[in-house]
From Swiss-Prot:
Name by which UniProt lists this protein: DNA-directed RNA polymerase subunit omega
Subunit field text: The RNAP catalytic core consists of 2 alpha, 1 beta, 1 beta' and 1 omega subunit. When a sigma factor is associated with the core the holoenzyme is formed, which can initiate transcription.
Catalytic activity: RNA(n) + a ribonucleoside 5'-triphosphate = RNA(n+1) + diphosphate
EC primary class: transferase
One Pfam family it belongs to: RNA_pol_Rpb6
Amino acid sequence: MARITVEDCLKQIPNRFELALAATYRARQLAQGHTPKIESRDKPTVVALREIAAGQVGLEMLKKVPV
């Protein structure tokens, strides 16, 4: 599979700080057993970035964070 780059993800979430937060939150969800939205055998962090680059996951991840 092709490598994922930050530039691919920045097309979906232009702010790199928000991108890092969204990817971190999604990777934690995947590590805890949530179902991935794309087919991949990669680690949760890579799957999270692939989902963001594909437009499957976005800034809505930050709105789901419990306070």
